[in-house]
Amino acid sequence: MAIERTLSIIKPDAVAKNVIGQIYARFEAAGLKIVAARMVHLARPEAERFYAVHKERPFFKDLVEFMISGPVMVQVLEGENAVLKNRELMGATDPKKAQTGTIRADFADSIDANAVHGSDAAETAQAEVAFFFPGLNIYPR
């Protein structure tokens, strides 16, 4: 199994609920190491650049508004099959369809306020990690 890195974002709704520590505990219990982390309040241009892949989608404007509505916690997770493992921990995008015990089933309110973002593929993860952690801000453990 390959050691990978993936980007995770704890979104404004989950930050406001004070569940960062509970979410981090799930990452670590699943064997994912947090190798970089920072809290940031995204500006509109940053959110628009990060989610540019969705620019033509009908939900783009609402997504950007939500992501700039409060601080987010951004982290790089490292471990075996980190991308897939994180996606399994997150659960389905719609918390109503998410499996019991997943982050979204436990902490998300709606398909829009769905607690977390995670890279969907190894290639995407590389670009997303570089977006938030350019240079040498990642420290292997």
Curated annotation (Swiss-Prot):
It comes from the Bacteria. Belongs to the NDK family. The active site is at 117 (pros-phosphohistidine intermediate). PROSITE patterns: NDPK_LIKE. Major role in the synthesis of nucleoside triphosphates other than ATP. The ATP gamma phosphate is transferred to the NDP beta phosphate via a ping-pong mechanism, using a phosphorylated active-site intermediate. NCBIfam families: PRK00668.1. The lineage of its organism: Bacteria, Pseudomonadati, Pseudomonadota, Betaproteobacteria, Burkholderiales. This is Nucleoside diphosphate kinase. Its cofactor is Mg(2+). Coiled coil: none annotated. ATP binds at residues 11, 59, 87, 93, 104, 114. It is an enzyme of class 2 (transferase). It catalyses: a 2'-deoxyribonucleoside 5'-diphosphate + ATP = a 2'-deoxyribonucleoside 5'-triphosphate + ADP; a ribonucleoside 5'-diphosphate + ATP = a ribonucleoside 5'-triphosphate + ADP. The gene is ndk. Disulfide bonds: none annotated. It holds the Pfam family NDK. It comes from Verminephrobacter eiseniae (strain EF01-2).
